[in-house]
From Swiss-Prot:
GO terms for molecular function: protein kinase A regulatory subunit binding. This is Small membrane A-kinase anchor protein. It comes from Tetraodon nigroviridis (Spotted green pufferfish). Binds to type I regulatory subunits of protein kinase A and may anchor/target them to the plasma membrane. A lipid is attached at G2 (N-myristoyl glycine). May be palmitoylated at Cys-3. Belongs to the small membrane AKAP family. Its main location: membrane.
Length: 80
C-alpha cells in the first residue's frame, strides 16, 4: 500500500469547498417547508433512541477494531 494524495488543490483544501461556494448554517425554521407536518413527541423519542443506539454500536465497533488492529503501527506518507 502507499500514500493517497488528495485530489483537491491546497487552496480548495484550506477553504473546504469549490471556488465561489459559500456555506451557511440553516436553522430549523428555514429547513422546514411551509405546510409540512411537525414531528410528534413519539417520533422524536424514537429518533433519539435510534441515534443513541447507532452511536453505541459505532463505538463498540471502533473499540473492537482498535483492540484487533491497535498494535499495527500507522505509517505516515513522507512523499512530497
Amino acid at each position: 500500500m502507499g500514500c493517497v494524495k488528495s485530489k483537491k488543490s491546497a487552496a480548495e483544501a484550506a477553504v473546504g469547498g469549490a471556488p465561489g461556494e459559500k456555506a451557511r448554517l440553516v436553522g430549523p425554521e428555514e429547513a422546514r417547508a411551509p405546510g409540512a407536518p411537525q414531528a410528534g413527541p413519539v417520533l422524536l423519542d424514537y429518533a433519539q433512541r435510534l441515534s443513541e443506539e447507532i452511536v453505541v454500536r459505532a463505538v463498540q465497533q471502533w473499540a473492537e477494531l482498535d483492540r484487533r488492529y491497535g498494535d499495527i503501527p500507522y505509517i505516515e506518507c513522507d512523499a512530497p
